């Protein structure tokens, strides 16, 4: 309750145009560049804070100017909002230089990036060589958050009330904002403990700090506070549901602004009853992904609660069908009235680019189908007005929306007859290799004649300044295509030559011509568009500009064959063709919303299938189709996993199954938990898979080994390349370290299964790290071969 015990509710007879969060990086990546200048020493703390405050004020004014009544504050984090929450709550592990009070920037960035021995870190008492907090995906988005590191008996304290500080900063600009903070149950659920205890056991210790935050906001006359609890979109055990009741029952008993509990990224499902019963003043629901439960929400949420209806897609770049969204709002209003309705995006706009107006090179027809964060605010405001005043005041917006929807629906470029016919002609046989793995392996070994523990790399070599400058020069017209091709060929020649000198068994061409493992392919496929300023935050200062899949996908010409075939012509050793898989291209793009994702993925798979066939015809004996995002595509709810895994596996097989038995299909996956999807990994039917295992010291191989005897082969039937070099670190591992890791792998796998390779591609490493590390890798494989050869029952490959 607010001070004095009087329960406040904002009084209105109209609906409210609301927003849950705004992109924090800036339309031209201002925050990214400020961070990088700060880290390089070219900007001091005051300059960094000033840049962030300028951007924050600009965001607030923009939202007010677009007609948003509930403007969020506290959503701009310097690195990550979950890290901000942990620091605000005093959840800072020992060694990072915090002993009380506000967490310093040195400590904050040491938690985010690891300690680097800088003068600022030394002055703050930060231990050298500390790792960054673990980073993982924010639900099923392409944003990454830092995982709070807690322990049993963790003490929490309010180091600084960030929501209050941001609320006051907005008030100084005459903007009455709605503070945003991550809720206590989601914070704990998303955390990990160092001792294996359940983070939710810390709820009792955490709630007093949240109560203090809310009390101070109430004392500052904040009308509303938005508390995000996105874990309500997950499968929750009963303990977590009870934790919600305890948390909000406790917080409701103290002074607080009106609480809007926000869920997003999916329907509430079986958590609807829990959410509807909580003693809060409003509930935000995702009616884009959770459209099917609209009537259930209307029935379940008490009439005296506010409902925030997320009808504008906050996760994708497509223009809203305003007429359909307005009909949804009107149906809810017919049941509840407009007195306590908010119109909002489905989630924070963090996940979309800032402003479509900056895109001057997009095809006009495609541009008309899109809406970025700025434009989505206009849609929210128009819908709120249409709900209150009817269609007449927004007839211009409705007409423009109708025209865009109609043009997109009727476009022959979006819906291609030839692509539809080809999809319809896909048969089961097209998704099966000609023979089972044992027969394929025999044919491949006869062709390749590889030794035990064959060595290779994952694909890319360092993208040096010279490589990037050549690509940029070609793009700007400062370098001719002929000269660019000459440089690429020279780099490939060098890479082939020194790989041979090192003694690697299966070579790669280095991917010097490629800018990005998705963009490179998307630029050569029909149905893709690319932006100039379509940046979204991946984590910290890292931003990505995902391709936009706007129409049916097809491959008009070979994409990689030229340089792969050239590389193979320079050596007698087997060369790998390198492709990105259909699931990963799908996951790392903005995907069209007018057909199922499965359909789009199948279209991409057919394009990759054509490329695989051309690589095989060009003489490439090994073709690697990378799927690092395979697990990322899993739906939030386990009941939906089976359907996703079925079509994801089918798409990989469609892309790779045309080849002869003697052609080896490899795939690569980055660090992931494989135990719960192991049958699907095996069902992909690749001849070899390479995975990141260095940091886990081969523990990830347990999923592949199953319950088979040590060294006897496991549940994964094919070959495996467990990474023996952590390429995310500049450190060069020794031969003996790699031998030790491979020995651990031999305890889980049969010798014939094991490939020797780095964890991942080497694009971000330097040559002075790559050459000695690969020398040690080859030496480690040779050492194991010698050990095996000395054994009395030495196996053949």
Residue ranges and their predicted role:
Residues 6-797:
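Domain-level signal for soluble alpha/beta catalytic cores
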């Amino acid at each position: 309750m607010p001070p004095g015990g009087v329960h406040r509710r904002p009084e209105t007879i109209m609906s409210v145009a609301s927003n849950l969060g705004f992109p924090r990086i800036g339309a031209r990546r201002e925050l990214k560049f400020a961070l990088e200048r700060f880290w390089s020493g070219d900007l001091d703390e005051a300059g960094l804070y000033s840049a962030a405050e300028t951007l924050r004020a600009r965001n607030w004014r923009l939202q007010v100017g677009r007609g948003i009544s509930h403007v969020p504050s506290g959503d701009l984090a310097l690195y990550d909002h979950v890290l901000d929450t942990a620091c605000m709550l005093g959840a800072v592990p020992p060694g990072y230089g915090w002993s009380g009070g506000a967490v310093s920037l040195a400590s904050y960035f040491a938690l985010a990036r690891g300690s680097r021995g800088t003068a600022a870190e030394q002055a703050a008492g930060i231990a050298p060589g500390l790792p960054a907090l673990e980073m993982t995906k924010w639900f099923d988005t392409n944003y990454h958050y830092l995982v709070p590191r807690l322990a049993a008996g963790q003490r929490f304290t309010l180091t600084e009330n960030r929501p209050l500080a941001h609320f006051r900063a907005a008030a100084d600009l005459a903007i009455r904002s709605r503070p945003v903070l991550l809720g206590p149950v989601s914070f704990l659920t998303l955390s990990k403990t160092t001792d294996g205890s359940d983070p939710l056991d810390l709820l009792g210790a955490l709630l007093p700090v949240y109560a203090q935050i809310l009390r101070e906001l109430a004392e500052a006359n904040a009308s509303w506070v938005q508390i995000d609890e996105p874990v309500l979109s997950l499968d929750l055990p009963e303990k977590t549901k009870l934790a919600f009741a305890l948390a909000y029952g406790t917080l409701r008993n103290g002074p607080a602004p009106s609480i809007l509990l926000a869920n997003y990224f999916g329907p509430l499902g079986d958590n609807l009853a829990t959410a509807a019963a909580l003693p809060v003043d409003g509930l935000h629901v995702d009616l884009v992904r959770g459209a099917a439960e609209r009537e259930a929400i209307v029935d379940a949420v008490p009439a005296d609660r506010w409902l925030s209806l997320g009808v504008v897609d906050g996760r994708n770049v497509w223009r809203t069908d305003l007429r359909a969204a307005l009909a949804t709002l009107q149906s809810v209003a017919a049941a509840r009235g407009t007195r306590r309705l908010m119109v909002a995006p489905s989630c924070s706009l963090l996940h979309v680019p800032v402003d479509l107006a900056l895109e001057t090179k997009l095809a006009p027809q495609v541009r008309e189908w899109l809406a970025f964060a700025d434009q989505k605010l206009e849609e929210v405001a128009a819908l709120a007005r249409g709900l209150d005043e009817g269609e007449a005041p927004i007839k211009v917006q409705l007409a423009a929306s109708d025209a865009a929807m109609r043009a997109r629906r009727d476009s022959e470029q979006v819906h291609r007859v030839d692509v539809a016919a080809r999809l319809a002609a896909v048969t089961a046989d097209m998704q099966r290799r000609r023979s089972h793995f044992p027969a394929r392996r025999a044919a491949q070994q006869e062709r390749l004649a590889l030794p035990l523990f064959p060595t290779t790399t994952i694909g890319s070599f360092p993208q040096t300044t010279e490589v990037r400058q050549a690509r940029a020069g070609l793009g700007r017209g400062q370098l001719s295509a002929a000269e660019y091709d000459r440089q690429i060929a020279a780099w490939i020649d060098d890479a082939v030559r020194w790989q041979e000198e090192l003694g690697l068994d299966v070579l790669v061409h280095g991917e010097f011509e490629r800018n990005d493992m998705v963009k490179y392919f998307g630029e050569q496929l029909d149905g893709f568009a690319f932006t100039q300023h379509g940046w979204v935050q991946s984590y910290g200062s890292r931003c990505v500009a995902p391709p936009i899949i706007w129409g049916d996908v097809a491959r008009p010409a070979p994409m990689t064959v030229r340089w792969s075939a050239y590389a193979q012509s320079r050596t007698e050793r087997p060369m790998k063709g390198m492709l990105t898989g259909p699931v990963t291209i799908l996951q790392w793009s903005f995907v069209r919303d007018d057909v199922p994702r499965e359909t789009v993925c199948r279209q991409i798979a057919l394009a990759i299938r054509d490329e695989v066939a051309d690589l095989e015809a060009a003489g490439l004996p090994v073709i690697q189709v990378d799927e690092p995002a395979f697990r990322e595509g899993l739906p939030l709810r386990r009941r939906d996993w089976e359907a996703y895994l079925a079509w994801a596996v089918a798409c990989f097989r469609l892309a790779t199954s045309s080849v002869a038995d003697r052609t080896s299909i490899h795939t690569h996956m980055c660090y992931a938990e494989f135990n719960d999807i192991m049958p699907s990994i095996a069902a992909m039917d690749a001849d070899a898979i390479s995975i990141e295992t260095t940091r886990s010291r081969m523990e990830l191989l347990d999923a592949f080994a199953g319950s088979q005897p040590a060294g006897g082969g496991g549940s994964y039937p094919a070959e495996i390349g467990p990474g023996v070099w952590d390429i995310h670190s500049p450190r060069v591992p020794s031969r003996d370290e790699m031998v030790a890791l491979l020995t651990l792998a031999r305890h889980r796998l049969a010798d014939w299964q094991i490939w020797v390779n780095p964890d991942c591609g080497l694009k971000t490493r330097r040559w002075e790290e790559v050459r000695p590390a690969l020398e040690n890798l080859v030496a480690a494989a040779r050492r194991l071969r010698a050990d095996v050869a000395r054994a009395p029952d030495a196996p053949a490959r």
